[in-house]
């Protein structure tokens, strides 16, 4: 009988905090600037420069800790993690080992019908490293220090996950919670949320952990799921062949769907941690914790309950609309403006989702305003434009955030309700399509649809489809 194996997974999730300036200096954290333009002596590790802690970093981390049921450390401090690498100009990273900002929390996930708590071991603050660029010159790597000193919170889970489905559920719940707090945009493609997967396998029924590996270079949930399945299979193959799994860090190549060893996996003692001498401990009072707690927003679970009760929309729609705080804000703001929650939901669920998919965007990337969506819904409801024109206008609202009222006026897209002009067109359509007329009178209802289509085409989509249908039936009696 073949051996059965269990996968054991823990995650280290690095989240870039949404402060305007870096953790220990006043340099901008803006993404995408020209290389080495958001730097100063502090974040490039110049001798004699001294760090000054950004208070907002601490408050964001406290907010995340409270939202994930962690205990906030009342006196926490920073430590130096010593290592040499080109993207680390100080040759050490300021992090937290001995007294991290939060500990002992959990995130509750749901996979299928099963609920499970994933424990959080600790949450600590640290500074990000720079970025190595390997593809500019053939034989040289370049370093961009813009990212050096950007504030990170690292969320370390216990090894409580047993499948890629549980991992993705945990990451999605964590991302949604942090986005609702406004502490980070958590965009994997931009690196503001990064997950390292620590994975081992063991025979089913045993309690001892196997040898773990750490998987890096995972920049999407799909890549994370594929890396987990690939590493699980690799480790099982080694064990089945009587070989040992080496404790190491591996880099995942999503194009090849395989990984390769980067380096042996280090332990804490390899980094020679010692207390950071240039920063005093952070004393966190109960009053400070209470102030942060009081500012906590309405989270997704609370919104789901309220949406069903207040707006009477289907559970599935509510789940999609609340998945992103940005989408939830658009829904609520637009509904407040036009008073039509079900129609707002339909526009977001159908047309917005269609365009997000077409443009390979996430809901956080939406740039159109609630005011313009509300105007579009009002134009369609009033019959000023028909449904096909409304969809055409929405494409421009989505891409350019145009004012739909002005766009309709400037492009002459208002629905034609002039019966005299419509009857003239209908008479010509009937005369030009005798076979369709015969078919309709012979009982073929589809033939009427063809005549409606010809009429809409002749009037460049600006006719009222209901009125066209009504008049055609009257004229063909």
Q: For each of these PLM feature ranges, what is it?
A:
Residues 18, 202, 233, 328, ...:
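Amphipathic alpha-helical core segments of compact helical bundles
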Residues 190-203, 308-330, 341-358, 371-373, ...:
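Core structural elements
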Residues 288-295, 332-339, 373-385:
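Extended, non-catalytic structural segments that build the interaction scaffolds
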Residues 1-298, 315, 336-340:
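Basic, nucleic-acid-interacting segments
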Residues 364-374, 378, 387-457:
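Strongly charged, low-complexity linkers/loops
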Residues 337-338, 344, 352-367, 375-380, ...:
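M16/insulysin-pitrilysin zinc metalloprotease superfamily fold
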Residues 3, 312, 335-344, 382-385, ...:
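Structural motif
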């Amino acid at each position: 009988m073949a051996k059965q194996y269990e996968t054991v997974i823990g995650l280290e999730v690095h989240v870039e905090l949404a402060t305007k300036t870096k953790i220990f200096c006043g340099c901008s954290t803006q993404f995408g600037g020209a290389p080495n333009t958001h730097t100063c002596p502090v974040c490039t590790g110049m001798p004699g420069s001294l760090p000054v802690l950004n208070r907002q970093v601490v408050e964001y981390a406290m907010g995340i800790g409270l939202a994930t049921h962690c205990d906030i450390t009342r006196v926490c401090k920073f430590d130096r993690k010593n290592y040499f690498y080109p993207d680390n100009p100080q040759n050490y990273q300021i992090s937290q080992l001995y007294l991290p900002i939060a500990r002992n929390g959990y995130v509750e996930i749901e996979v299928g019908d099963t609920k499970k708590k994933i424990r959080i071991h600790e949450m600590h603050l640290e500074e990000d490293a720079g970025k190595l660029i390997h593809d500019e010159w053939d034989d040289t790597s370049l370093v961009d220090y813009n990212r050096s000193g950007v504030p990170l919170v690292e969320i370390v889970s216990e090894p409580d996950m047993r499948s890629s489905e549980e991992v993705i559920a945990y990451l999605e719940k964590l991302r949604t919670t942090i986005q609702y707090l406004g502490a980070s945009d958590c965009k994997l493609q931009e690196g503001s949320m990064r997950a390292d997967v620590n994975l081992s396998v063991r025979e089913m029924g045993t309690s001892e952990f196997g040898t773990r590996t750490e998987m890096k270079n995972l920049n999407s949930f799909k890549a994370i799921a594929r890396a987990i399945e690939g590493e699980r299979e690799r480790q099982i193959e080694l064990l089945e062949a009587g070989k040992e799994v080496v404790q190491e860090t591996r880099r995942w190549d999503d194009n090849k769907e395989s990984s390769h060893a980067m380096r042996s996996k280090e332990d804490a003692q390899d980094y020679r941690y010692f207390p950071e001498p240039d920063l005093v401990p952070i004393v966190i009072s109960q009053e400070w914790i209470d102030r942060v707690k009081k500012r906590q927003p309405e989270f997704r679970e609370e919104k789901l309950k309220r949406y069903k009760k207040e707006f009477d929309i289907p559970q599935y729609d509510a789940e999609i609309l609340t998945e992103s705080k940005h989408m939830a804000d658009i829904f609520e703001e637009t509904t407040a403006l036009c008073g039509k929650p079900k129609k707002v939901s339909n526009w977001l669920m159908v047309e917005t989702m269609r365009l997000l998919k077409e443009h390979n965007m996430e809901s956080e990337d939406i740039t159109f305003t609630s005011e313009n969506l509300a105007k579009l819904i009002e134009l369609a409801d009033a019959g000023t434009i028909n449904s096909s024109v409304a969809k055409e206008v929405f494409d421009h609202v989505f891409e350019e955030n145009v004012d739909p009222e002005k766009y309709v006026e400037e492009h002459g897209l208002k629905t034609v309700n002039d019966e005299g002009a419509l009857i003239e067109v209908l008479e010509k359509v009937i005369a030009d399509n005798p076979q369709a007329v015969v078919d309709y009178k012979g009982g073929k209802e589809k033939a009427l649809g063809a005549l409606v289509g010809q009429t809409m085409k002749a009037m460049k989509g600006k006719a009222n489809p209901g009125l066209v249908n009504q008049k055609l039936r009257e004229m063909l009696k």
